[in-house]
Structures are given as C-alpha cells and as structure tokens.
Amino acid sequence: MKFIRPVTLILLIAVVSGCTAIPPVDFTVQDVGMVSNRKDAEIKSLTVGFAPQEQQSIVEANATIPPLWKEALQDALNRSLIFQDDASIKVNLSVRIVEFDAPSFGVEMTTTVGAIYEVVNRKNGDLLFAELVESAGVVPPDYAFVGAVRAVESWNRAVRNNIAAFINQLEDADFSKPMYRGENE
C-alpha cells in the first residue's frame, strides 16, 4: 500500500506533464497601436540576422529565430504606421541580434535579448537611427508546470518586449538630425 501512493503520484505527474503542449515560437507584439509621431520615410528593406561573432555576447538561438523576428517586426511596423508610403525619404532597416540568452533550466524562466537596430537613408547613406535595444522576458513558475513551456514563452516575451521598445525609441527619434552623415551628399 505504501508503494502504490508514490507510484500513483509519479504516474499522475507524468500524465499531467505529457498533456501540456509547448507553445509555438511567436514573437508577434499584440498591443501595437498607431504612433503619434510618424516618420517622413518609407521603409524599402527590412533585414534581421545575427551580428558578427565579435559583436555577440551570448547567442543561444538557431537559424529559425531571425525570420520569425523579422515577421513579427514587420507586423508591428505595419500596425504602428510609423513609416509612410510614398514618402520622399526611402530607408533600410537592419536588425542585428547580439544577444539571445535563453534559460536552459530553472523555476522562473528569464530570457534576455539584445539587438542593434539601424535605419539608413538609401539615397545618401545617412544613419538616421542606431540603437542597441535590450529586453527580457520573465515567466513565473505558476505559468506552466513544464519547464520547456515556460522557456519558450520567455523567448516570446523577450523578443516582443524588444520590438515594442524599439518602436517606442524610433517614435522619439529625429530623422532630420542624422547620427552619421553618409558619403553620398
């Protein structure tokens, strides 16, 4: 009888754990609204990738992360209406991921991410915006019993927070004062 209780408890935990589905990797920011300070610029190109090794701190991510980040960023930019169609200034937006520190285990799962966002004027090469945006995604232990579920959700939250922080910083940026003047004046 004493043997049956622990075995039953272990089986119950295994069944409950097995029923939990790992959420998809989804970086889409849900609460993006139209910004009040729109830029007189049209985005022509958007790229997202990993920074060169010498710029990276901790990157524990595979090649599936940049395309998902790009898709979520494009969605957030579209919904924020921060860039204008048919504007006189055409720009490229480049994102280089310098940190993706995902938790391997733990009770409270925290993922930290960092990315360098650069907006460049296509006509003259002026660097209109360049910032390292850092963020974290924290998932408490009561979110889910299975650690893998909390870990993936912490990735999602970290990148969502990063994209939202970028849009907030970009809204405050002044494109009339380039950070760096390009060569083609």
Where are these regions (language model features)?
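A structural "domain/chain start" motif
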Residues: 18-71, 171-185
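Extracytoplasmic/secreted envelope proteins and their assembly/folding machinery
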Residues: 66, 70, 74-78, 114, ...
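Surface-exposed short loop/turn segments
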Residues: 20-28, 80-130, 137-153
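Residues that form or immediately flank small-molecule/cofactor binding pockets and catalytic motifs
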Residues: 8, 53, 138
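Compositionally biased, intrinsically disordered linkers/stalks adjacent to structured regions
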Residues: 143-185
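Extended alpha-helical regions
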Residues: 1-2, 97, 110-113, 177-185
